[in-house]
Amino acid sequence: MDTIKTEKRVFPTNMLRVCVDQFTEDVKGRVYSKLSGTPIMFENCCELLLKTDAMFDRCGYPQTFQEKHDFNGKKVSNCYTSPEIFLADEELETKCGQLTTLDVFVSSRRNTSWQGIIKQVNKDAVIEFRSDIELLSGIKHLLMKGI
C-alpha cells in the first residue's frame, strides 16, 4: 500500500477518510475518522453508511436534525457535546486505500440522510451529494471513472 504524500493538513471533525481496497459489484474497505480510535471496516455500501452513521450518533456530531426512536417507541436522546478526538491529523493523512482514497465531508444530517461533498485524494474530482443515495452513487462514479 502506497502512502499518500501531502502537505500538512488540518482535517475537520466531520470528515471521513474512505479507503477503498476492493471494488467489484460493491465497495469494500476502511473508514478512518477523528471520531473513532479504530478503523471502521465495511464489506459493502450498506455497512459503510450504517457503521459510520452509528459512529456519528455516538459522538453527536454532525448533529442529526430528527428525533430517533427505539423499537419500543421511546425517543433516543441525541448528545450535543463537543466530540472527543481519537485520531490526529498527521495520522489520518497517512491512511490510504489499495484502490483509491476518498475524503467525505458530511456537512449535515437532515431528513434522515447526509449532505456534503466527496473529494478524491490527490485528484481534482469533487462531487456534491444531498442524500445517502447520491453519496453512494458519487463514490461508485469516482471508482468507475478512476479504476
Regions found by a protein language model. Give the residues of each.
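Intrinsic disorder/low-complexity detector
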Residues: 1-18, 22-24, 52-112, 142-147
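Broad hydrophobic/π-residue packing in well-ordered secondary structure
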Residues: 14, 27, 41-45, 100-102, ...
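Short aromatic-glycine-(Arg/Gly/Cys) micro-motifs in beta-strand/loop hairpins
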Residues: 20-36, 107-123
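Mixed-charge, glycine-accented linear interaction segment located at domain edges/termini
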Residues: 35-43, 49-57, 117-147
